[in-house]
């Protein structure tokens, strides 16, 4: 039974690692080409114009059902200028294309692209040739100015807008007129917020009734995720997701869109594009019935979006419609406030029901300590305390195994290579000594889901991004740059083995000796925060096992005396 126990432990270790890789293969992105984007300074991160020849922003608008009227559309004005409208708040820097009013550039000044260059903000949206990722919205339908043949050219009072000191809200109006109808596309941004409102004010001064639909969509090409690290072979999910009445969180991968588009009518809800640490989501009015669509356009871009209900404006009448756009970090508390299910875009995988409470507890510990590294250490101590009864039972079983080791050696000498008789004799000995040979496996079985859940917490939570601990650990979300923690972890595993009884089978003993080396190799590229958890967990296990083993040995000697 000892060899079976060893095989089980080894299998759990290998299967756990394979499960992480398999989850990424099933739900992560396919192998994608890497991009080579030149670094730029913070002030130059949003160019004044879109490079000529890149029409990814204006291609392939959604269609409306024939009953809403999509035929006989006149061509819209063609842009004569590609100057972008610059908009800056304390947390968002974005550029709006006057043709269509799409957000084609967006950076996050609070999130540096790299730790060693804090002046360069992370770029979320880009339509500059290297990558296509943008947020589009417009008015389509019978009288809508956004058509497949062209987009409206909006005018603004100025070319740049900035949230001033002491100002809590910034409003940017884009104006366009056609056939007696005046349109205002309004962007409303707030201080400290990553969500903004995009509104359409339609003033029908013509003699005819106006009809159309608002659409909003996210468009992205197949380029790699610039915020993801694949050193462990487990890149996080890059793809679309949406809310439906039956599923509060439904993924639609690029592979799904390659196979065909999705169409579904949803009341309210949201559509989003996910990447490592960041999410972009369109959130329509909760009362609207929307037609959600996913598709791949003629240029190979992947699109998820929705088309709202019909808008009817009588002659001389006015109508306003709006949607919310979130473009920023995956902050769970904020996402939950914006729309139900949106917090699930912090994708913890199939163990989310364990990961979410772990993150909740970790966040509360951090609110007291102010350091994520020390918070992980305290969390480890709490988890270890929670599993103390199971661990104690396991270590008692190991201590009894150690006590009967001489008897096992005698059985081996007696039966030699007769494995069947040896196994029968061992089982009789275990039964006589009241030892469960698999008793040491239970804590491993129970802790493995917690370990995997914590892995995804540390990998997916934006709070861990570039979070320092101390000394050489400046980012808990990536591997230890000097591999010191993995080596310490391997050493602690070796010490644990010395406290365990020596397996009677030579092959089993060799396998067990290899385990610290195997685990050390796996952990070389794991997030430093996860390795820190495992090191502390091993140290606590060593102390606990040493104490219990010595207590049992002392009790045995006392009973013998």
Curated annotation (Swiss-Prot):
One of its GO terms (molecular function) is membrane insertase activity. Its main location: membrane. CDD domains: 5TM_YidC_Alb3, EcYidC-like_peri. It is found in: Cell inner membrane. InterPro entries: Membr_insert_YidC (IPR019998), Membr_insert_YidC_N (IPR028053), YidC/ALB3/OXA1/COX18 (IPR001708), YidC/Oxa/ALB_C (IPR028055), YidC_ALB_C (IPR047196), YidC_periplasmic_sf (IPR038221). GO terms for cellular component: plasma membrane. The keyword Plastid does not apply. The chain crosses the membrane at residues 7-27, 342-362, 368-388, 438-458, 469-489, 516-536. It comes from the Bacteria. GO terms for biological process: protein insertion into membrane; protein transport. It holds the Pfam family YidC_periplas. Keywords: Cell inner membrane, Cell membrane, Chaperone, Membrane, Protein transport, Transmembrane, Transmembrane helix, Transport. It is a multi-pass membrane protein. Belongs to the OXA1/ALB3/YidC family. Type 1 subfamily. Required for the insertion and/or proper folding and/or complex formation of integral membrane proteins into the membrane. Involved in integration of membrane proteins that insert both dependently and independently of the Sec translocase complex, as well as at least some lipoproteins. Aids folding of multispanning membrane proteins. Interacts with the Sec translocase complex via SecD. Specifically interacts with transmembrane segments of nascent integral membrane proteins during membrane integration. This is Membrane protein insertase YidC. It comes from Pseudomonas entomophila (strain L48). The lineage of its organism: Bacteria, Pseudomonadati, Pseudomonadota, Gammaproteobacteria, Pseudomonadales.
